[in-house]
UniProtKB/Swiss-Prot annotation:
Catalyzes the attachment of tyrosine to tRNA(Tyr) in a two-step reaction: tyrosine is first activated by ATP to form Tyr-AMP and then transferred to the acceptor end of tRNA(Tyr). This is Tyrosine--tRNA ligase 2. Its main location: cytoplasm. The gene is tyrS2. ATP binds at K223. It catalyses: tRNA(Tyr) + L-tyrosine + ATP = L-tyrosyl-tRNA(Tyr) + AMP + diphosphate + H(+). One of its GO terms (cellular component) is cytosol. The keyword S-adenosyl-L-methionine does not apply.
Length: 302
């Protein structure tokens, strides 16, 4: 099965910026990045599902880079509702180190911190080299920004998408990155990066988003929703992760098997054919597989 076909079958593709990306994914060799801001000291299950795509693409010969946004975390991503409180710099730096150590155990790829290339940029240089390429009207039309105008948005959060666009430009010019992958809530920020690279270099780069992982009620797995399941053993033990997955509903268990495991299409379709609602058969396989992949332990249930 071709890579893009597998990603679509697993429900891991929501938007992509150009049809030519399909050919590059299936037959080319791309350097791509996926990232998170260190606003917490651990990945949660929603992050894990997104970061798994790095492994999926790496298996087909593509080169992943993982970005931890030390700079963007200090600014705060617009939520489309209300202004975030600014995080303390010391806390962000501490979170970065903890995330880096955690990520390296599961995803053995190069890790970069956008604080490293933004910390010494002067305000004048930022405005001249980057701000002049993106208009206020363009930024105001992004969906998250439009929604937040009702309650007010600071210039700090308004500038977040430009900082993320700078990341794409920096990684393109220094590491040859031509693809950014993220959750679907980041689409507006990602297309800003595409436009910034095109305007500054004349080159085409790409973006692809994944649907956010949600529960049976449509709520995403994340700390902003208050239902995060953490990867760190200090926040959720392997047993707690296992129990959570054992109790997911029949409505979403097959979808989670596709998104959270490397089980083949043949294996998952066989599990689906054998699964009967209320038996917990598919949930058991999901819980055992994901817990072992993350923590390297098997949970014996009597």
């Amino acid at each position: 099965m071709k890579l893009f076909e597998d990603l679509q079958w697993r429900g891991l593709v929501k938007q992509y910026s150009s049809d030519s990306l399909i050919e590059k994914l299936n037959n080319g060799k791309l350097t791509f990045y996926i990232g998170t801001d260190p606003t917490a000291d651990s990945l949660h299950l929603g992050h894990y599902s997104s970061f798994l795509i790095a492994k999926r693409l790496a298996k087909y010969g593509h080169q992943p880079i993982i970005l931890i946004g030390g700079a963007t975390a200090l600014v705060g991503d617009p939520r489309g509702t209300s202004e975030r409180d600014l995080a303390e710099q010391e806390k962000i730096f501490d979170n970065f180190e903890k995330l880096k150590n955690q990520i390296q155990k599961i995803f053995p790829y190069e890790i970069v911190n956008n604080y490293d290339w933004t910390k010494n940029i002067m305000a004048i240089d930022f405005l001249r080299e980057f701000g002049k390429h993106i208009t206020a009207g363009y930024m105001s039309n992004k969906e998250l920004v439009k929604r937040q105008f009702a309650t007010g948005i600071s210039f700090t959060e308004f500038s977040y998408m430009l900082l993320q666009g700078m990341d794409f430009y920096h990684l393109f010019t220094t590491k040859g990155v031509t693809l950014q992958i993220a959750g679907s809530d980041q689409w507006g920020n990602m297309t800003t990066g595409i436009d910034l690279v095109r305007k500054k270099t004349g080159e085409e780069v790409f973006a692809m988003t994944m649907p956010l992982i949600t529960d049976e009620e449509g709520k995403k797995f994340g700390k902003s929703e208050g239902n995060a399941i953490w990867i760190s053993e200090n926040k959720n033990t392997p047993e707690e992760l296992h129990n959570f997955l054992l109790n997911v509903s029949d409505d979403i268990v097959i979808s989670l098997l596709k998104k959270l495991t490397f089980l083949s299409r043949k294996d998952i379709e066989e599990i689906e054919s054998r699964h009967k609602n209320g038996t917990g058969y598919a949930q058991g396989i999901l819980a055992d597989t994901v817990t072992f992949d993350i923590h390297g332990v098997s949970i014996n249930k009597k």
